[in-house]
Every structure is written in C-alpha cells, then in structure tokens.
Regions:
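Short hydrophobic/aromatic beta-strand micro-patches
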Residues: 299-301
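Short beta-strand segments
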Residues: 10, 95-97, 147, 155, ...
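Glycine-rich beta-strand-to-loop/alpha-helix junction loops that act as flexible
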Residues: 108-109, 292-296
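Short, well-structured alpha-helical segments that form the helix of a local strand-helix-strand
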Residues: 128-139, 281, 309-312
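Conserved, helical-rich catalytic subdomain that frames metal- and/or nucleotide-binding sites
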Residues: 54, 153-288, 303-331
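DPxDG-like acidic metal-binding loop motif
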Residues: 104-134, 145-149
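ATP-binding N-lobe of GHMP and related small-molecule kinases
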Residues: 1-104, 122-126, 130, 167, ...
Length: 331
C-alpha cells in the first residue's frame, strides 16, 4: 500500500451535449448514444485509511445501500482484499463536500463514486485498470465515464466510450430547481411511455422544447400493453430528437456557435418545465441551452468570458437557482 493515508480529489459533474435513448435491453437497462463532457462544477472527495469499516459523510439522506460512494468503497475493498471489512482490510473514511446537485442530471453520485475508486487506487493499489472499470460499471452507467472524464462519445448503456474533441473555450452556467426531481429510472419510464402520444401532440411539444429534429413518436414496436418493445425505440433507428453524430461533427469544427446549435436531449420531451429556463438563458446571451442528462438541471453555453449578469438576473428573478458559472479555457 501507498504510504499516504489520505487523498483529496475533485469529482467533476457532467453534461450531455447530445443524448439519444436508442433502446431498452432485456435486462431493463436502456441503451444510449450520447456525447458526455465533464464540467468545472465539482464535488470534493477526501478518502482516508484507518480504523475499521467504511463510513461516508456529506451525503445526508441517502441510504447506505443506495450510496454510490459507499458501494464504490465496498467494491474496491472486495476486489483487493476479498472482503469489505475484517482482518487485513483497512478501514475507509469518505468525506464529500457536495456542490453538484443531487438528482440533477449531472451524475453527482457517479462522480463521487469514481473519485472514491481513484482515491483508493492511489492509496492502496493492486487493482488493475480492467477490474477498476468493471467495478465502476457495476455501480452505474455513468460511473465509467466519471472515472476517465474529459469528453467521450458513449454508446451501449454508456460504458462503450470513444474519446472525442472537447468543447472549445467557453463559459458555462448551470441552473437548478428547473422542475420536479425524479429518478433517472422514472424518467426512462416516462420516455418509454412517450411513444404512445399522438404525432400532432409530439410535434407540438418538440417545437416547444426546441428539439433539433422531428420528434414525432413512432408506434412501431408498441405492444398491446402500450409498452415499447424490447430493443425497439423511436422509428427503428433509435432516435427521438437527439443526434450524437451531428454533435460530433460540430465538435470537430471547434466553432462554439455551431456546437450550441447541435445540442439536443431526448429527455426534454418529458421535461417540459425546462423550456422556460432555456428561453431565459438563450434570451440573455447563451448560444444554446439544454437539459442536463435526465434533468431537472439546465445548462447554458456562452462565449468564453462573456458577461452573464443579465442571464443570472433573469434566472434568479424567475425563481431558479444559479448553481455554477465558470470559464473553461483551451486545454
């Protein structure tokens, strides 16, 4: 083991520049085609060795069995020592300073779990990269991305990752309290049910949320129970309104305005509350705005160094919370 007893790491949240839900597997997991990008909005995670057992602080209200940081420590210790506690297994203390909104669509819990895995690997070692990746995937679909960070084109359930170009220099604003917080599982279920809406209603809603493609649902594949069939989504191509390929092309141009114009997220179809926030942002200087993951947080993309005072004032006056404003220069 390393001689260090404590490590403190940043745990960056993520945004999805494009998010298309492409299907549902027989095991219930949904497949996606998405472009993920880490942000400057981070939790701070400190992991220390000593004592016995595993303790996690800073995640009040989250049960131990649902706490991804706790489960990450358990998974790592079992892989390294064969047991999460007992003789020969060090005690682990995890302290989390939360900044990423809980259930906000920015993978805050996944980011914390990934930070715990990286910290333990730094403190203890002896677990190979492949095993670390397997532990990450066992915790949740976003944890593998949070483990590596950067910018990735992700498919499968999010675990098949291909590096892509990062955003050029930009200013990011993240707005919270943009709707009712619902679990990711609930949002996927609502998107499943979206295919039952008639085409006229769907087209109207797509126009309201500013989708970049025709979002009319397709009845093909819907069973007698009204549930979308396994492996069938959208019009057979797996697309509702989002277009990861278009985003990848836009990123390759390194033109922020074009990138903002290519942003899209299928979950906006079942998150109508995000529309008002998006309009506030784009009406006050943002080149584009989009729902964060499954929501309900929303981000706005601005030119690097842009004056965002008007946008902040408009957002706060409407009763929303500005969670983060930050510049990301070139790497």
């Amino acid at each position: 083991m390393n001689c260090k007893e404590s490590v403190t790491l940043r745990a960056p949240g993520k945004i999805n520049l494009s998010l298309s839900v492409t299907g549902r597997r027989a095991d219930g997991y949904h497949t996606v085609d998405t472009v993920m990008h880490e942000t400057g909005l981070c939790d701070v995670v400190t992991v220390s060795l000593g004592g016995r057992g595993i303790s996690v602080s800073g995640t009040d209200g989250i049960a131990r069995e649902s706490n991804l940081a706790y489960r990450a420590a358990v998974g790592y210790l079992r892989a390294r020592f064969g047991a999460a506690e007992g003789d020969g297994t060090p005690g682990v203390t995890v302290e989390i300073e939360k900044h990423i909104p809980v259930s906000g669509g920015m993978a805050g819990g996944s980011a914390d779990a990934a930070a715990v895995l990286r910290a333990l690997d730094s403190l203890i070692g002896g677990v190979g990269g492949e095993t670390l990746g397997s532990i990450a995937l066992s915790l949740g679909a976003d944890v593998p991305f949070c483990l590596v960070g950067g910018a990735m084109h992700c498919t499968g359930i999010g675990e098949v990752m291909t590096p892509c170009r990062r955003l050029p220099p930009h200013r990011l604003m993240v707005v919270g309290d943009c709707g009712v917080k619902r679990s990711t599982a609930r949002m996927y279920a609502e998107l499943d049910g979206y295919a039952q809406v008639d085409a006229a209603d769907s087209e109207r809603h797509a126009e309201e949320v500013g989708s970049v493609r025709d979002a009319a649902p397709y009845a093909e594949g819907i069973g007698a129970d009204g549930v979308l069939g396994v492996g069938t989504y959208g019009n057979g191509t797996g697309a509702f309104c989002s277009d990861a390929h278009g985003m990848l092309q836009a990123l390759d141009t390194a033109e922020l305005r074009r990138i903002a114009g290519a942003m899209s997220n299928d979950f906006e179809l079942v998150n109508p509350a995000c529309t008002d926030v998006k309009r506030l942002l784009t009406g006050n200087g943002a080149l584009g705005a989009l729902l964060c993951g499954s929501g309900p947080s929303v981000f706005g993309l601005f030119e690097y160094g842009a004056d965002v005072d008007a946008a902040e004032e408009a957002v706060r006056a409407a009763g929303y919370t500005v969670l983060y404003v930050g510049d990301s220069p070139a790497d």
